[in-house]
């Protein structure tokens, strides 16, 4: 190793990492090689694992890097402030609606409608409504007197617990809201939102988000994103669409739904329902157009899957498995696999056609390129060899078999060997051969190399 400058801070860090993980001897040799006696005494605040996972990487960067990092942090904070302002403006104090505007907005109360869109809406508890139009949207609304609407956009809005609203747009945000009647939401952003206590909702769309909501009457939803959402305690719902998401909801009256996503959702305890569509997911729940494994435990739980390869296992009494196509319950405990198979076969045909076309194009390109290559006259030692793209096997037999006693020029090797070898090659059996080649003829008119 030689001399390591102690300014780097990494040296003691490695030393302590080795000692903590039981590599005491290595730590001692490390100390000898670095020649620093204070290594063993000094304590290091940073953990090597944290350093490697880039959590605590800043202290070891150069001043320039730190400057860059500060700039990015400032821009992050600015965007955070903007999003908070927007959310404050969008939420009036009395009976708030959460809607995504600047694209034509529609809001409805006490009903759920969706028009000309890929949408999945799940509404639970009385007097709740969710509507979405002309968009890929998923909206889940729970508890009385709440409404959420999104139009002409990829949006997801969830409103839960009466008199709560959430809206925000185009920001990278981290929002945490605690205590009742609070809301945190972010769209088109990377966000981490955690909401705790009753009547809180957190939603994020088109983002990488981690949202965890705890306490009763809470919902966390994320759309078009990589998200992890976990909601615990009763009356909670977590939904994610167009995303890779993990959502786990525990305790009674909870629902988790995810669409167009890779999601893992697990709901435990009684009165829980969960939906997921167009996704690869491991869900406690239901999945449509996806490969999924779903397990729902405890009584009064439902899991439904449509148009998918899915395996669902429901444990404990009072559980149903439904298959739904476009949100409607078609039959109990049945899976529609035919439609998905048909669609895949159609896709295969299309792809094969495209492949053939591309092959034809490549072939044409080769022909045009070979003519130009062969027409070139360059003074390289291999000018006689010709164009490599024209090289082929000497005979069709060689194409199938790697070696069938035929040499590069199509002659049978075992016959020709006897002729081409010189005198010195064949001698009495017990005498040592003097060399592999002694005389004989060499074919000087070789026009191509074959491999």
Swiss-Prot record:
Q: Which top-rank group of organisms is this from?
A: Eukaryota
What is the predominant subcellular site recorded for this chain? nucleus
Question: What PROSITE patterns does the annotation carry?
Answer: LISH
GO annotation, cellular component aspect = nucleolus; nucleoplasm
The protein's matches in SMART domains, at most eight in alphabetical order, are given as: LisH (SM00667)
Q: Pfam families, per this entry?
A: LisH (PF08513), SRP40_C (PF05022)
Q: Which keywords are on file for this protein?
A: Nucleus
Give the Low complexity compositional bias ranges. Answer: 99-120, 146-174, 200-228, 301-319, 333-343, 369-380
Asked whether the keyword Nucleus is assigned, the reply is: yes
Q: Provide ranges: composition bias, Polar residues.
A: 320-332
Location(s) in or outside the cell:
Nucleus, Nucleolus
Record field: compositional bias (Basic and acidic residues): 73-98, 344-365
The UniProt annotation puts the region (Disordered) at: 59-394
Q: Where is the composition biased (Acidic residues)?
A: 135-145, 189-199, 243-253, 278-300
Signal peptide, first to last residue? none
All copies of the LisH domain together span 6-38
Gene Ontology process terms (BP):
nucleocytoplasmic transport
Which InterPro entries does this chain map to?
Answer: LisH, Srp40_C
Cystine crosslinks:
none
User: What is this protein identified as?
Assistant: LisH domain-containing protein C1711.05
Q: Which organism is it from?
A: Schizosaccharomyces pombe (strain 972 / ATCC 24843)
């Amino acid at each position: 190793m030689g001399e390591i400058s102690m300014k780097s801070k990494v040296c003691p860090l490695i030393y302590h990492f080795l000692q903590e993980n039981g590599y005491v001897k290595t730590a001692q040799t490390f100390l000898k090689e670095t020649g620093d006696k204070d290594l063993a005494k000094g304590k290091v605040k940073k953990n090597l694992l944290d350093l490697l996972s880039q959590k605590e990487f800043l202290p070891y960067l150069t001043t320039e890097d730190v400057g860059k990092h500060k700039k990015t942090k400032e821009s992050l904070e600015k965007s955070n402030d903007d999003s908070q302002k927007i959310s404050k403006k969008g939420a009036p104090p009395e009976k708030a609606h959460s809607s995504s505007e600047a694209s034509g907005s529609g809001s409805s109360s006490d009903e759920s409608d969706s028009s000309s869109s890929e949408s999945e809406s799940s509404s639970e508890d009385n007097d709740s409504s969710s509507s979405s139009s002309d968009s890929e949207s998923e909206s889940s609304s729970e508890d009385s007197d709440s409404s959420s609407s999104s139009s002409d956009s990829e949006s997801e809005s969830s409103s839960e617990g009466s008199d709560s609203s959430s809206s925000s747009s185009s920001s990278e945000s981290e929002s945490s809201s605690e205590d009742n009647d609070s809301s945190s939401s972010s769209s088109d952003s990377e966000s981490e939102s955690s909401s705790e206590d009753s009547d809180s909702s957190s939603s994020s769309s088109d983002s990488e988000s981690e949202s965890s909501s705890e306490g009763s009457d809470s919902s966390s939803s994320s759309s078009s994103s990589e998200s992890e959402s976990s909601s615990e305690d009763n009356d909670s719902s977590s939904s994610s669409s167009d995303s890779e998401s993990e959502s786990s909801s525990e305790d009674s009256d909870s629902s988790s739904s995810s669409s167009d996503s890779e999601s893992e959702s697990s709901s435990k305890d009684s009165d829980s329902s969960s939906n997921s569509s167009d996704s690869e997911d491991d869900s406690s729940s239901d999945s449509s157009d996806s490969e999924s494994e779903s397990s729902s435990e405890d009584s009064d739980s439902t899991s439904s899957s449509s148009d998918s390869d899915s395996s669902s296992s429901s444990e404990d009494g009072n559980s149903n498995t439904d298959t739904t196509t476009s949100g409607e319950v078609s039959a109990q405990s049945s899976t529609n696999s035919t439609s998905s198979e048909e669609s895949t076969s159609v896709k295969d045909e299309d792809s094969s056609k495209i492949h053939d076309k591309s092959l034809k194009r490549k072939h044409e390109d080769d022909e045009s390129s070979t003519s130009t290559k062969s027409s070139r006259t360059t003074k390289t030692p291999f000018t006689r060899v010709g164009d490599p793209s024209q090289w082929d096997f000497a005979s069709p037999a060689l194409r199938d078999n790697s070696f069938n006693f035929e040499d590069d020029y199509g002659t049978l090797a075992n016959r020709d060997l006897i002729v081409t070898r010189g005198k010195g090659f064949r001698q009495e059996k017990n005498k040592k051969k003097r060399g592999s080649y002694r005389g004989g003829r060499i074919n000087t008119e070789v026009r191509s190399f074959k491999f």
